[in-house]
Amino acid sequence: MIIMKKSIIFLQIALFAAFATFAQVDRSKRPEAGAARAPEIGKYEMFELSNGLKVFVVENHKLPRVSMSLIVDRDPMLEGTKAGYVQMAGDLLGRGTTTRSKDKLDEEVDFMGANLSTSSTSINASGLSKYTEKLVEIMADVVINPAMTQVEFDKAKEQFLSGIEGEKDDAGSIMNNVFGALIYGKNHPYGEIITKETVESITLEDCKNYYNTYFKPNISYVAIVGDVKLKTVKKLFKKYMSAWKPAEVKGEVYPLPTSIQKTAVAFVDRPSSVQSVIRIGNPIVLKPGDADIDALRVMNIILGGGSMGHLYNNLREDKAYTYGAYSTFGTDELVSVFYAYAQVRNAVTDSAVQEFLFELDRMRTGEASADEIAQAKASIMGSFGRSLEQPSTIAGFALNTALYNLPADYYQNYLKRVEAVTAADIQRVSQKYISGDKLLITIVGKGQDVAPSLGRFGDIAYYDIYANPTEAPSFLTMPEGVTANDVINGYINAIGGKEAVAKITAYSMKMEATMAGLPAPLIMTISKRAPDYY
């Protein structure tokens, strides 16, 4: 009994001590972050074939699957009056080989439950690891022996034209066309626009010439991830890919864009719009691996990288102008862009632009708080850590390191670089990459409701959906003193007056539609007794 009492006393003392320690913690302050740890990044192996093809292998035996991506590292291309032929050539790669028709190729891929896709710079294949050899053999056949027949070319062209037609009234597609053309210029690979006319001018020979010029092993890389062994992969690629012949590929050089001289408004009138698509930005030069990237990434999280950003909290949470407002930036060996964007109601378009400009200026001239910086860093580090759970991330790191000549420990030191970003760094990159007086404000919306109030932000220029300059749309305005009743009465007088309307006893409507599968048009007639208007 005495022992029990002593135990109770010791327990009470321990609890009191723990409570006292707990009570001393000031929970109004964020705990100090520990030093950034070096991430545990998975390993990869690399080998190179005699033809120059470089292959990166990430072994992961958790699941019996494998994925392969072949990347052709060519410079951007200016396609001119045949814009679209590069994309079409990439599509044709997956439409059969000289040894397999398209139907045969599709049948073999489907039988394995696999996936195969092609583009103008890549071939991707994935499936069960027991089919690894078959997938390598098919990938090799596609990249070395594309058929590119006239029949498949005609089909691809028809589908391409159909897609362009569907994008003509899509506000997002219109914005991509116009913003890109005005930021980079139409005589730049990133600014030219694919149209019906450019696609119609493409020939099968154009697509073949593209393939023959750029699909070369000495400028290509392959990443393989999954349940495979390096020794097996080496054997398969030597067997199936060694026949791919190397050749010299000419590089391209393009001048930097200089199209934006001062902040201005570019407006595309879309009369059916009930909301405006807004994009505000400027070109930037930021190559992969640049020392500014980490600070800029922290800055972008604070400004508009998500729901914690200034733009989101201002335009959505505070003003309720939109469901979300964000910002983003890109990296590119040539040139890229920074921009902020949202979709807002017509009635608040000018107010939204004002808030965008306010937040961009605040980012350039103000100083981010310690709490904002800590949250942004935590978000970036958390995303990075989660990405390491995917073996494909390791393959991506390997490819980027090779493609952009990054230091071998670039990703190993990533968290340390993010942790080292300061408030001064954030302000410096904000001023460097967000233009204060050379912003392009691009809006796709209903000109009648939106355009007249935008002149205060800069000179307004009007464009069609392909970034061609147009005249300002005519805005109908109600003459002073005219009411809705005046308009209705004017219409009634124009058709004969109240006496004529009163004599109408019935009316009918006839509607006709043609539908696939019906032997004849569908006709509907509706007759109604006229209402007593007076």
Regions found by a protein language model. Name each.
Residues 2-11, 512:
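Bacterial N-terminal signal peptides that target proteins for export
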Residues 10-20:
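Bacterial N-terminal signal peptides
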Residues 28-64:
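N- or domain-start disorder-to-order transition segments that initiate the globular core
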Residues 58-62, 69-71, 249-308:
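His/Glu-based metal-binding/catalytic segments typifying zinc-dependent metallopeptidases
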